[in-house]
């Protein structure tokens, strides 16, 4: 039986929305940040409590300003490695928030933190899908480089 190619149609993939692309890019960025912060053996430290674990073993990309601030969702300087305990539960406590603030001031300076605070008050940016896709592609390339550096590729 010959297949009639003229009438045969492939199921088309649904195009992703901008918010879906932003979420995928954010996941990739968090992975990249953990890899970048890890040593050559793949271990990184939580910026708030100091526990050291493998980059993919109960470590997450913690946000200084929460992801609800879309300005910072794809902002690399706002994301750092945190253990799951600090990221999920600890950020609700003043002690962990203060530890993260001290880390940020040591890393970037008080002036930069104030500038980020002013940015957090702005309206959410309108991401263009092609820009987000390109950003994600670049991050995925950086992830490959980091995986190669720690010997996991």
Kindly label every feature range from the protein language model:
Residues 1-32, 37, 51-52, 116-153:
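A boundary/linker detector
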Residues 21, 71, 92:
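Conserved aromatic-histidine-acidic binding/catalytic patches
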Residues 45-79:
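Histidine-centered nuclease catalytic patch
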Residues 51-54, 79-109:
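Short Cys/His-centered divalent metal-binding micro-motifs
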Residues 76-86, 105-136:
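Short Fe-S-cluster ligation motifs
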């Amino acid at each position: 039986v010959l297949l009639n190619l003229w009438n045969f149609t492939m199921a088309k993939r649904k195009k992703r929305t901008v918010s879906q692309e932003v979420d995928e890019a954010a996941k990739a960025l968090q992975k990249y940040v953990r890899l970048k912060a890890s040593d050559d053996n793949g271990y990184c430290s939580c910026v708030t409590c100091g526990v050291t674990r493998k980059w993919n073993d109960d470590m997450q990309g913690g946000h200084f300003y929460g992801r609800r601030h879309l300005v910072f969702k794809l902002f690399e300087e706002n994301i750092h490695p945190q253990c799951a305990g600090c990221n999920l539960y600890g950020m609700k406590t003043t002690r962990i928030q203060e530890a993260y603030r001290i880390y940020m001031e040591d890393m970037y300076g008080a002036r930069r933190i104030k500038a980020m605070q002013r940015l957090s008050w702005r309206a959410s940016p309108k991401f263009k899908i092609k820009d987000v896709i390109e950003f994600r592609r670049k991050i995925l390339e950086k992830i490959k480089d980091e995986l190669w550096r720690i010997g996991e590729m």
